């Protein structure tokens, strides 16, 4: 069971109470981690957590089963860049930026690092934050 599924269960059972307010009306896009989504077919649980924050989900064109890897699953996090036009995490970050989010959420620590680096590369770190979805919920627990 992934932590987003556990959090969804706890909220549904009333064992975890979330206060709204902090993220009310914020535009949040969710980056699907490769192993969570494509390998384990978990797409809905993370998205079903956002209504408890009263946030607005804005989907990237490539999401769920069609989502692009941020590069961490391909070990880009641990090696030097290869020749090419663009880093894969920057390309994925650009896809996220197209939907004008306030926040990019994910559910993988490696994706979090890659997307954070992409936001920094695009010099948007003062406008857009990257969080694990559990962090967003934690900030709003009663």
Task: Give the positions of each predicted feature.
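Iron-sulfur cluster-binding electron-transfer modules in prokaryotic oxidoreductases
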Residues: 1-142
């Amino acid at each position: 069971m992934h932590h987003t599924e556990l959090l969804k269960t706890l909220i549904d059972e009333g064992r975890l109470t979330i206060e709204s307010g902090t993220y009310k009306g914020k535009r949040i896009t969710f980056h699907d981690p490769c192993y969570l989504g494509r390998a384990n077919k978990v797409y809905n649980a993370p998205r079903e957590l956002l209504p408890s924050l009263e946030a607005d989900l804005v989907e990237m064109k490539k999401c769920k089963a069609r989502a692009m890897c941020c590069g961490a699953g391909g070990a880009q996090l641990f090696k030097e860049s290869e020749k090419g036009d663009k880093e894969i995490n920057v390309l994925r970050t650009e896809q996220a930026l197209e939907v004008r989010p306030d926040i990019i959420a994910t559910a993988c620590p490696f994706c979090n690092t890659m997307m954070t680096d992409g936001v920094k590369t695009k010099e948007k770190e003062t406008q857009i934050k990257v969080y694990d979805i559990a962090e967003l919920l934690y900030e709003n627990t009663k």
